[in-house]
């Protein structure tokens, strides 16, 4: 009888949690409605490169400049469609913000997507097609691009290939050279483990070994040590990670299945398995010497996932015809747009959009 009551109690708790989740999704949808005569809040399925993909467009005035946000990974929709309602409250006053869950991940996850189409050239063309779609839709010549982490590989290459379509490019935690990135972060975590005298961590880190790695899973193993030394999230880590994780389940734009699949890293694994051989050999710092659009780098001082020192070196050598700025977020690691959200918004509005200093 006691076991029966326990089972009933567990079922009751699970049902209550499920109901609470559904109610919160309804609350979030209505509390973030855009009440503006020329506003837009539209979840849309479009075809890019022949593959169905999802975008979420939000803004209080469709005459505002268009800003496309590229999530990380590739294959990790952070910040993706699921983040839009919570993260863009200020930005939608000044931009028409477009979140895109890239092919193979988040709301655009589909195992039927041809594996051979998961490559950077195809992602660049997907983005180019998306920009064309938005230029026609909103009668604008150029759009702003804001990319984070793995999304910066796509964003920077697109800005170099199609400068005529892009008003300005912002790279947050800009990836450039995966081998160098992993070498610097490996040295960091090993030195921290030695500094703290943690022998077991030292042995575990040495077992991972130096790059190059034959699988993205080695990077995942390293990530937990980077995180433990605050090189992933420096400022309010529990709050930041809690927000990112819960977004997948609470977003009205995601079905529960889509949210759970994302939390289980289905899209990330699918994409990384297909792209790892290409990604591990990327050397944008050697490939790109100049750029024809205004370019900004937003870098967390303590970021050891994508070490800021590598971006500083690239910034110094980059020839930027229309100007370049490197902005360090003094209280952030890999997620300055979350760790110092207010400053991030102010910089996008006052510096990138309005051309301030």
Where are the language model's segments positioned?
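Conserved alpha/beta-hydrolase
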Residues: 90-109
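Short beta-strand/loop motif that positions the catalytic acidic residue
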Residues: 291, 297-299, 303
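Catalytic histidine-centered segment of alpha/beta-hydrolase-like enzymes
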Residues: 332-341, 345
């Amino acid at each position: 009888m006691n076991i029966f009551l326990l089972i009933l109690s567990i079922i009751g708790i699970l049902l209550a949690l499920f109901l609470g989740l559904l109610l919160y999704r309804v609350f979030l949808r209505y509390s973030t409605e855009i009440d503006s005569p020329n506003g837009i809040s539209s979840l849309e399925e479009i075809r890019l490169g022949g593959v169905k993909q999802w975008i979420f467009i939000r803004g209080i005035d469709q005459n505002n400049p268009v800003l496309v946000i590229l999530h990380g990974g590739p294959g990790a929709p952070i910040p993706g469609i699921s983040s839009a309602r919570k993260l863009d409250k200020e930005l939608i006053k000044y931009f028409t913000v477009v979140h895109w869950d890239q092919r193979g991940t988040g709301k655009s996850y589909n195992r039927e997507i041809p594996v051979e189409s998961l490559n950077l050239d195809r992602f660049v063309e997907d983005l180019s097609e998306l920009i064309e779609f938005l230029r026609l839709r909103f009668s604008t010549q150029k759009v702003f691009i804001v990319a984070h982490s793995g999304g910066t590989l796509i964003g920077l290459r697109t800005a170099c290939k199609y400068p005529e379509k892009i008003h300005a490019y912002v790279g947050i935690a800009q990836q450039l050279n995966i081998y160098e990135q992993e070498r610097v972060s490996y040295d960091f975590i090993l030195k921290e483990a030695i500094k703290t005298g943690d022998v077991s961590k030292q042995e575990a880190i040495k077992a991972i070994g130096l790059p190059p790695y034959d699988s993205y899973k080695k990077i995942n193993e390293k990530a937990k040590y980077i995180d433990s030394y605050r090189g992933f999230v420096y400022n309010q880590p529990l709050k930041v990670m809690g927000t990112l994780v819960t977004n997948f389940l609470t977003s009205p734009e995601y079905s529960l299945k889509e949210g759970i699949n994302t939390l289980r890293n289905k899209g990330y694994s699918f994409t990384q398995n297909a792209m790892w051989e290409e990604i591990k050999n990327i050397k944008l710092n050697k490939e790109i010497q100049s750029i024809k659009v205004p370019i900004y780098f937003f870098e967390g001082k303590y970021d050891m996932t994508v070490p800021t020192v590598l971006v500083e070196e690239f910034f110094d050598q980059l020839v930027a015809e229309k100007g370049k700025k490197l902005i360090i977020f003094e209280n952030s690691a890999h997620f300055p747009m979350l760790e110092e959200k207010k400053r991030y918004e102010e910089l996008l509005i006052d510096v990138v959009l309005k051309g301030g200093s």
